[in-house]
Amino acid sequence: MKLVDLTADLQALLASPNVHHNLSAPKLTEKVISRNEGTLTSTGAVRATTGAYTGRSPKDKFIVREQSTENQIDWGAVNQPISEEAFEKLYAKVVSYLKQRDELFVFEGFAGADEKYRLPITVVNEFAWHNLFARQLFIRPETDERDTQAQPFTILSAPHFKADPETDGTHSETFIIVSFEKRVILIGGTEYAGEMKKSIFSIMNFLLPQQDILPMHCSANVGEKGDVALFFGLSGTGKTTLSADADRKLIGDDEHGWSDSGVFNIEGGCYAKCINLSEEKEPQIFRAIRFGSVLENVVLDEKTGEADYDNSFYTENTRAAYPIEMIGNIVQPSIAGHPQAIVFLTADAFGVLPPISKLTKEQAMYHFLSGYTSKLAGTERGVTSPQTTFSTCFGSPFLPLPAHVYAEMLGHKIDEHGVQVFLVNTGWTGGGYGVGERMKLSYTRAMVKAAIEGRLNQTDMTADSIFGLRSPVHVPGVPDEVLQPENTWSDKQAYNEKALFLANEFKENFKKFSHADSIAKAGGPLV
């Protein structure tokens, strides 16, 4: 199928009389209720459930193998290839399916808060609540801002359309397929709205480096003096909690680009985890869940419509989507200067990484490529033991290009702008999980505050002999003995054994980066 034919099909679909273009949040909310797609909560938010899929489906994600991009993609388990022929057949089926719907909902907006680098996007939805999600998550145009000269990336979302693996070349009835050449994303067989968000992020992770912009899976905030801080970290490391700071304004909570001008948010909204949410712990998120926001897979009280955030009946991965303006203390537009500090967050359940370390450029590249944290997994007898988790660049599922591309860009920008980089362990101290205790949040906040305010740039440091990490000997508000993990363990031999174990885990994981020997030697464990 030629691009001109595909474009004509798409234009015909968008011109259909059953298509609603750019409905407001109130109108979309009306549609959600009248179409029985969801219910209103006691605060006026829309609540929808997603059926069998309550999270992303990475094994069902494909990139079309096309001549123009074939040699750029890092093909493998994350970026699975699918043929152009299979894509075109499935595209025709999805378009035909959507044409037969009674109603369709279209959002036309952008990804990228910096006007110089933003990407026009068109989202075509079978569900009204999905369109409300897209409207609140991406960047909404002010008046008629869309540049008609730039061809948008188009998402065709058909949750009730199911693929046939035998004839369609998919692994299951579910599919998320990206064609960079055709600028189309097909999503079918899943009602999980997060697939739309992360598909656009994957697109930006491919396009932005071509403009010498580093795409990043991180949160970002800025102080009164314009000092920008970035926070990288996998789930459970405290990224959301630590980047929400009353003394600093939020740039964005999840996806950013770093250009020659500075940092910009890729999105116009937030997609926050809701499990165990409370007004006391996270007041900004709690108060943002009101009319215009979307709750996904959250249990409601049948009589009152109140959300039960502690209930994981549908999934632990309960979510809220809302425009960033719904929380206070933000930067508008979501753009700021170059970062002064970068914080890599890890929750080390083995209790051997220092609570805070200042990294060299090579160590920063090493830990960026590693993307380490640990998770607690239950065993048959109910005992939990830590497991190492590594996610390249803290965002492995969303990286179409080889990892070294992103790491080298980071190293260059650290050099160019003199950025201070810190590794912060929000995990265990005084022993591993089951022996020690979780690092006190007040200590972590004090360390992060000192780091991003530049108060650790000239302080005395001491280096450990296993990881080669340099830690401050003193941080205001934190007991000195806590800063050196070995000192908090009563059994020094046990500490040494566990530290050597984790160092070896790092080295084993890093073997997949065959191109990065120099980084491993200069930035990895010493043993």
Curated annotation (Swiss-Prot):
Catalytic activities: oxaloacetate + ATP = phosphoenolpyruvate + ADP + CO2
GO terms for MF: ATP binding; metal ion binding; phosphoenolpyruvate carboxykinase (ATP) activity
Annotated binding of Mn(2+), by residue: 198, 217, 254
HAMAP family: PEPCK_ATP
Cofactor binding, note field: Binds 1 Mn(2+) ion per subunit.
Organism from which the protein derives: Bacillus velezensis (strain DSM 23117 / BGSC 10A6 / LMG 26770 / FZB42)
Pfam short name (any one): PEPCK_ATP
Family of the protein in this entry: Belongs to the phosphoenolpyruvate carboxykinase (ATP) family.
Domain of life assignment: Bacteria
GO biological process, one term: gluconeogenesis
Protein's name according to its UniProt entry: Phosphoenolpyruvate carboxykinase (ATP)
Cellular component GO terms held in the UniProt record: cytosol
Higher taxonomy: Bacteria, Bacillati, Bacillota, Bacilli, Bacillales
Biological or metabolic pathway of the protein: Carbohydrate biosynthesis; gluconeogenesis
Residues that coordinate or bind substrate: 56, 192, 198, 319
Positions bound to ATP: 198, 217, 233-241, 282, 319, 444
Function text: Involved in the gluconeogenesis. Catalyzes the conversion of oxaloacetate (OAA) to phosphoenolpyruvate (PEP) through direct phosphoryl transfer between the nucleoside triphosphate and OAA.
SUPFAM superfamilies, alphabetized: PEP carboxykinase N-terminal domain (SSF68923), PEP carboxykinase-like (SSF53795)
Subcellular location: Cytoplasm
EC number: 4.1.1.49
CDD domains: PEPCK_ATP
Keywords attached to this entry: ATP-binding, Cytoplasm, Decarboxylase, Gluconeogenesis, Lyase, Manganese, Metal-binding, Nucleotide-binding
Disulfide-linked positions: none
Needed cofactors: Mn(2+)
